[in-house]
A protein has these predicted regions:
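Extended, well-folded interaction surfaces typified by the phenylalanyl-tRNA synthetase beta subunit core
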Residues: 1-115
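A carboxyl-terminal module marker
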Residues: 2, 6, 59, 129-136, ...
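Small-side-chain structural scaffolding
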Residues: 14, 100, 142, 185-186
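Residues forming anionic-ligand binding surfaces in small-molecule and nucleic-acid pockets
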Residues: 16-27, 35, 78-83, 121-148
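Hydrophobic alpha-helical packing residues
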Residues: 45, 120, 158-161
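Glycine-rich, charged/polar anion/phosphate-binding loops
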Residues: 66-68, 87-88, 102-106, 119-130, ...
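A generic structural signal for well-ordered coil/turn residues at beta-strand boundaries
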Residues: 76-78, 97, 114-119, 136-139, ...
Length: 186
């Protein structure tokens, strides 16, 4: 059964009736469409990353706690879980992007190096101040994989990215269980 949402039922009805039999209804009032205010910034960020030699990946927002925490050596933290997941690989909504990139690299190990990838996508965070108790944010993550990959390479990417947006920044040593101690900055 391929019914995960109300839209799936509507799609099945449309298929049964026949898409070619559906007459379009045109609005009487002219309307103009435009991108959301942050979409221009997102497009510029994507163009910058491509210009820096990265390929964009598009991963699903649904994932599982093993990918988010266990495989990333992170302690479990609160996240949004699906009430009735259909598959064990999609039981929650991602709250950060890096696990998706690592999974992408993992299944593409046979692809020729270097692999330089990024994702600019939505993550969903718990936010009890909101009516829905959640907040969607656009995040950017990048990864590079090849025998000579190092901190300087990814830092120079970040430097170029920030300079193009006119942002002054500096990196400070930090720690994260997903990375080797002493090789993490934020």
């Amino acid at each position: 059964v391929d019914i995960m949402h109300q839209v799936d039922i509507i799609e099945d009805v449309a298929i049964a009736y026949g898409y070619n039999n559906i007459e379009p209804l045109w609005r009487e009032l002219p309307t103009t469409g435009e991108a959301k205010p942050d979409q221009h910034l997102i497009n510029v960020a994507r163009d910058l990353m491509v210009g820096l030699g990265y390929q964009e990946t598009l991963n699903t927002t649904l994932t599982n706690s093993e990918t988010l925490f266990t495989k990333m050596n992170m302690p479990n933290s609160p996240l949004i879980e699906l009430a009735n997941p259909k598959v064990i690989t999609m039981t929650c909504i991602r709250n950060w992007l890096l696990p998706s990139l690592m999974e992408f690299l993992s299944v593409n190990q046979s692809v020729e190096f270097p692999q330089k990838i990024f994702e600019l996508g939505k993550v969903t965070l718990l936010d009890h101040t909101k009516e829905t108790k959640t907040r969607d944010e656009n995040w950017l993550a990048a990864a590079t994989a090849h025998p000579n990959a190092n901190f300087s390479e990814i830092k120079s990417t970040l430097d170029s990215f920030m300079v193009n947006f006119g942002v002054e920044w500096q990196i400070k040593e930090s720690s994260n269980p997903s990375f080797i101690e002493g090789r993490v900055g934020s």
